Amino acid sequence: MLEQALITHCAPTLARLKPGGMFALAGVDGAAMEREMRSLNRLLLPKGVVLTVLRRCGQSTLFYLYRPCELRAILESEAARAFLRRCGYADFAPEAALRVLRARLGEGEGFPHEIGIFLGYPLADVIGFIRNGGRNCLLCGHWKVYSDAVGAARKFARYRKCKEVYARLFQSGCPLSRLTVGAKPA
């Protein structure tokens, strides 16, 4: 079940086009899901990818698939740090930042807007979304774009193509291990 969801919702992260992806599943058996997550992480970790839970709410579970090295690079950006400090973050190691994000997700029904940083959205678009209350965007795709519409449109097209190719390959029997691109060499 989780493998199919990863292909459907996180193909660009598996393909190393995005630092992170997120999806929710409802009605998931907790113990079975934990076993499947452990099994998937044994497969994904050597390739520099981690699957974790951000929030459980009733029968729904919010998952986050990410590349820690790429998230670390984003969190090392001084602009991202300044923004996240204003949101209550003090430690910018990926796991520490994820702990704060999990806590903020647990505070209410909605998503804290900084979640876009963890998904690889441009900081200018995250800030634009907040300033405009989600209105007046230049382009709407994987996220609402407020800065570079041309560059974002190119990314959206790459993500769309990636999802199509990954879905086709997975349906034809290609295993997740082959569809997960390894981490960049250090």
Label each PLM-derived region with a short phrase:
Residues 36-95:
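A glycine-rich, hydrophobic loop/mini-helix early in the fold
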Residues 86-113:
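Internal catalytic-core helix/loop-beta-alpha segment
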Residues 111-139:
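Hydrophobic/aromatic-rich, well-ordered segments within soluble, folded domains that form packed cores
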Residues 45, 131, 135, 164-168:
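Generic secondary-structure signature for well-ordered alpha-helical cores
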Residues 142-186:
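Long, compositionally biased
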Residues 58-59, 97-101, 130-133, 140-147:
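Short linear loop/turn motifs
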Residues 18-20, 59-61, 112-114:
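Short, surface-exposed beta-edge/turn micro-motifs
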Residues 1-57:
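A structured, charge-rich N-terminal accessory region that forms the first stable segment of a protein
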